[in-house]
Regions:
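Conserved P-loop
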Residues: 1-70, 126-128
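Conserved catalytic network of the ASCE P-loop NTPase/AAA+ motor domain
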Residues: 23-27, 43, 73-75, 106-114
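Flexible phosphate-sensing "switch/lid" loops adjacent to ATP/NTP-binding sites
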Residues: 70, 77, 87-90
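N-terminal targeting/trafficking signals and adjacent low-complexity tails
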Residues: 74-77, 98-99
Length: 135
């Protein structure tokens, strides 16, 4: 798992989009990019699959957990899943989404998919369950 973090407005979304576009060049599997807005969808290069959680009425932690499990289950060729704003998507504080990170860690281990996420906050603000993934 890879985490892009920093306070709001510090370029996390641009960094994760750039990373997704760079991963496309070497990825052997499919790439999925998930967020809750259409704002940056056109900045992703094809064939990266762009998913807006608002289109699927995902508004809670449990719904998002099911959403990411479904993405992994529906396509065994998914290599990367990029998530921009995991806490925002779940309508939770960052400190409250530990079970989502547990789910992603389990999916990485069991299915070999790589999760790349953005988290808003300084390094000091990040909960321990996220800090262990920070470079």
């Amino acid at each position: 798992m890879k985490i892009f973090y920093g306070p709001k407005g510090t370029g996390k979304t641009k960094a994760i989009i750039d990373y997704a576009n760079e991963a496309k060049a070497t990825a052997k599997g499919h790439i999925v990019y998930i967020t809750d807005s259409d704002k940056y969808g056109f900045e992703l290069k094809l064939p990266i699959r762009f998913l807006n959680t608002s289109d699927f009425n995902v508004k809670s932690e449990d719904e998002f957990r099911g959403f990411i499990k479904g993405i992994v289950a529906s396509n065994g060729d998914n290599e990367y899943v990029f998530i921009d704003g995991v806490a925002r998507i779940c309508n939770k504080l960052l400190s409250e989404v530990g079970s989502i990170f547990d789910t992603m860690a389990d999916l990485e281990k069991e299915f070999g998919v790589k999760f790349v996420l953005t988290c808003s906050g300084t390094k000091e603000d990040l909960p321990d369950f996220i800090l262990k993934y920070v470079d």
